[in-house]
Amino acid sequence: MKQSTMQWETLLSTKRFGMEAYHKKDTEDRSEFQRDYDRLIFSSPFRRLQNKTQVFPLPGSVFVHNRLTHSLEVACVGRSLGTNIAHQLSILHQKSSNFLPEIGSIVSAACLAHDLGNPPFGHSGEKAIASFFSEGNGSFIKERLENETEWNDLIFFEGNANSLRLLTHQFKGRRYGGFAMTYSTLASIVKY
């Protein structure tokens, strides 16, 4: 059986969500993936991570800092890993796309965004939100929602899905497509 190779030109796209009609192939001083990273750094949702605690239970002590610091650290490690993987892929697939060097930028942008939609206390916070609506004082809201899908978003709250919502939702007075991230960056954020 013949082994198929990945089509990097198809997998890595500079097209932006919500701006498909405005796609241009020629870039200026930054790549489209570096623009994704920059859009995240300067965004309000990213800056709000400074108010969320990140707790690492380590043997003998508990290390506490905020999720903004955590996300910046994760982005640095992710960029290094992505760059190393891209280097190895370029050796294996010498005729592949010129996008391979951009994998580090894509991974670092995904790492920056990985906690955007998560509540304080991570998975415990997700469970608290879900139980507040399904079993607690928030159950009355079900009657006010337009459909079952909205209710399920609350009782099965999931931080990764909320991150994607934050990045793609059109906020009041803003452009269609939310952050208008590249499809490659959005795809890498879906499930880290």
Q: Model-predicted segments: where are they?
A:
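Sequence-structural signature of the catalytic-core scaffold of metal-dependent phosphohydrolases
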Residues: 1-29, 41-52, 61, 72, ...
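Alpha-helical architecture
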Residues: 68, 112-113
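Low-complexity, highly charged intrinsically disordered N-terminal segments
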Residues: 30, 65-68
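Short hinge/gating elements
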Residues: 57-63
